[in-house]
């Protein structure tokens, strides 16, 4: 009868569940890549050109599926785990349709900023509603499936199964990861996070952002070690002095998405589109700057420039503004602003976007800036053609106002643009 065939099929799947888990893991991994890359053939190319990386990604998914052996509701948990991976891949695909940097664990810390940016080029209120509706529907389905769905009736190994799963998660994955990294199948650090996800797969890239929280604590780290380093530095340091009344004002501008059009070889121009920049380039010091991000993550370029600390010290996709600088045991961090303040400079930030975006209001106070003039404090009347971002014209007057506010001081002003923000 139908009931007997149903139970025989269930018994067959349970008997060979490890094999089916491997097949399911490969399917999930491929599906996630198709969604993330938004192209079926790109996913096929990834499997063909990075086969071992693809199989390693599938191994991570396989390990996550092994958790089902601890419970009777195995079918339900398989659906849940499958749904979670595909949901993460879908989020990544949506994000990559609006920016270059893929989805990472640190983006969860950006959720308050994201919800504050509805009806922008990033996403609309309608898109947010659809996402919430789909997630809610899936949760309702899961609840009903957990209540009404089948339960495992076979014998459970209450000791062997947990030990095997713990060994797989705690020993198997680290050893396999180390072997894959040593064989150059995957990389331990992504100089370019977008390229890393593309070459090594979303599952590994996202997992790295979860467990990779930056540099480990050095074995010899102690108060005595730090005191010895401080003594060594103090023995050779020199004091910075500037003649009174001759301190130069310093203006640092982060100009989003700016390039020299002449660097694009296939473009032909009837006249110089950026004559002022080229005049400065010809008459003063100039050069190229290597930055840790492309297409998103502006705050990490800021962090490197202002503090001198490399993003290689931090985890994959991490934003120090949203992590270390928000910890209570980090009252301050040395920066250009704090160093200039110590020799009498006034230090200011001017930015025509929301103060809380990337938690800049907190970060800049930790870096020692005296003032932060954000969008909320400006009289903004002009916006870009898309209507999403204020034009940067307002920053000229606001930068001058910041310097004029300290008549008897020289100033360091860090001005951040937003008009050229986002996709074109």
Label the predicted regions.
Residues 2-197:
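Transmembrane and membrane-interface helices of multi-pass
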Residues 34, 117, 209, 232, ...:
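Residues that form generic nucleotide/phosphate-binding pockets
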Residues 39, 104, 184-206, 260, ...:
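Secondary-structure junction/capping motif
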Residues 99, 107-119, 205-214, 223-236, ...:
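Short alpha-helical interface patches
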Residues 108-111, 199-203, 226, 274, ...:
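Alpha-helix initiation and N-capping motif
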Residues 174-252:
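Membrane-interface segments at or immediately adjacent to transmembrane helices
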Residues 236-248, 252-255, 260-424:
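Solvent-exposed soluble domains appended to multi-pass membrane proteins
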């Amino acid at each position: 009868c139908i009931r007997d065939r149903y139970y025989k099929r269930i018994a067959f799947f349970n008997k060979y569940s490890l094999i089916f888990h491997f097949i399911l893991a490969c399917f999930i991994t491929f599906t996630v890549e198709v969604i993330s890359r938004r192209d079926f053939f790109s996913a096929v190319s990834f499997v063909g050109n990075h086969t071992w990386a693809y199989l390693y990604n599938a191994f991570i998914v396989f390990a996550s599926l092994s958790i089902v052996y601890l419970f009777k509701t195995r079918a339900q948990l398989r659906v849940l785990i499958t749904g979670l991976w595909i949901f993460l891949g879908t989020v990544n695909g949506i994000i990559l349709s609006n920016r270059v940097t893929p989805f990472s664990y640190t983006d969860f810390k950006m959720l308050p900023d994201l919800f504050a940016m509805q009806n922008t080029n990033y996403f609309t209120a309608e898109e947010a509603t659809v996402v919430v509706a789909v997630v809610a529907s899936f949760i309702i389905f899961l609840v009903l499936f957990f209540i009404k769905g089948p339960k495992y009736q076979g014998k459970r190994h209450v000791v062997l199964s947990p030990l095997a799963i713990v060994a797989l998660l705690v020993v198997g994955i680290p050893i396999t990861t180390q072997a894959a990294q040593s064989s150059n199948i995957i990389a331990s650090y992504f100089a370019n996070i977008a390229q890393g996800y593309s070459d090594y797969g979303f599952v590994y890239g996202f997992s790295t952002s979860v467990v990779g929280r930056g540099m480990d604590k050095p074995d010899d780290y102690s108060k005595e070690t730090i005191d010895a380093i401080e003594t060594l530095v103090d023995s050779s340091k020199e004091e910075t002095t500037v003649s009174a009344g001759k301190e130069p004002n310093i203006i640092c501008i982060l100009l989003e998405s700016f390039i020299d059009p002449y660097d694009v070889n296939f473009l032909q121009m009837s006249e110089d589109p950026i004559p002022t920049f080229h005049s400065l380039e010809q008459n003063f010091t100039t050069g190229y700057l290597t930055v840790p991000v492309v297409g998103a993550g502006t705050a990490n370029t800021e962090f490197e420039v202002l503090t001198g600390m490399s993003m290689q010290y931090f985890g994959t996709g991490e934003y120090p503004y949203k992590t270390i600088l928000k910890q209570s045991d980090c009252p301050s961090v040395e920066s250009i602003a704090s160093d200039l303040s110590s020799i009498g400079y006034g230090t200011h930030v001017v930015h025509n976007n929301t103060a809380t975006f990337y938690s800049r209001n907190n970060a800049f106070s930790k870096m020692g800036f005296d003032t932060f003039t954000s969008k909320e404090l400006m009289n903004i009347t002009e916006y870009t053609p898309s209507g999403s971002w204020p034009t940067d014209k307002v920053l000229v007057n606001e930068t001058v106002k910041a310097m004029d506010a300290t008549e008897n001081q020289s100033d360091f002003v860090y001005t951040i643009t937003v008009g050229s923000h986002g996709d074109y």
